[in-house]
Amino acid sequence: MPKQLYFSKFPVGSQVFYRTKLSAAFVNLKPILPGHVLVIPQRAVPRLKDLTPSELTDLFTSVRKVQQVIEKVFSASASNIGIQDGVDAGQTVPHVHVHIIPRKKADFSENDLVYSELEKNEGNLASLYLTGNERYAGDERPPTSMRQAIPKDEDRKPRTLEEMEKEAQWLKGYFSEEQEKE
């Protein structure tokens, strides 16, 4: 396996907590909820249709494994799994990536609000990686009736590399435990 891993052209190797021969999972720069992570094929391709059958199988096997561990670690009862497959679907980084967002009962009073948050998160992803830890001045959101108030996009600061590396190291421990059981 290559030593450095790239999410498109952005190095993310130190944020990786799970890796197979063909896929990898890493912590999110600007998570919507705690535990929001990304799973990617190691080969950078923009669309699902560009993956080989082996890459596609490995990607979704990895998504399932990461989802199971993330739900356990974050005490979640469900997850949102999301892909923006192409520019017209909202993809801003030209590298297939699957969002896993662990969910708990009543974390949003309107369950579908997570999708608008995902769109906002994805819409700024490339510029966040390009500008490091600069803040993003996003659009104002309409008021919502969420039980858990999600901070406005501009208030969700990108995490530091140190914060993401620490979370990745913590999560790696759970995957080591899972691998020992297999």
UniProtKB/Swiss-Prot annotation:
GO cellular component, one term: cytosol
Record-annotated HIT domain positions: 3-110
Entry EC number(s): 3.6.1.17
GO annotation (BP), single: diadenosine triphosphate catabolic process
Catalytic activity field: P(1),P(4)-bis(5'-guanosyl) tetraphosphate + H2O = GMP + GTP + 2 H(+)
Classification via InterPro entries: Bis(5'-adenosyl)-TPase_reg, FHIT, Histidine_triad_CS, Histidine_triad_HIT, HIT-like, HIT-like_sf
Enzyme's top EC category: hydrolase
Annotated stretches, region: Disordered: 135-161
CDD domains: FHIT (cd01275)
Motif (Histidine triad motif): 95-99
Keyword Transcription set for record: no
Annotated binding of substrate, by residue: N28, Q84, G90, Q91, T92, V93, H99
Compositionally biased spans, kind Basic and acidic residues: 150-161
Keywords noted in UniProt: GTP-binding, Hydrolase, Nucleotide-binding
PROSITE patterns: HIT_1, HIT_2
Active site feature: H97
PANTHER family given in the database record: BIS(5'-ADENOSYL)-TRIPHOSPHATASE (PTHR46243:SF1)
Role description: Asymmetrically hydrolyzes Ap4A to yield AMP and ATP.
Protein name per the record: Bis(5'-nucleosyl)-tetraphosphatase [asymmetrical]
Name of the coding gene: aph1
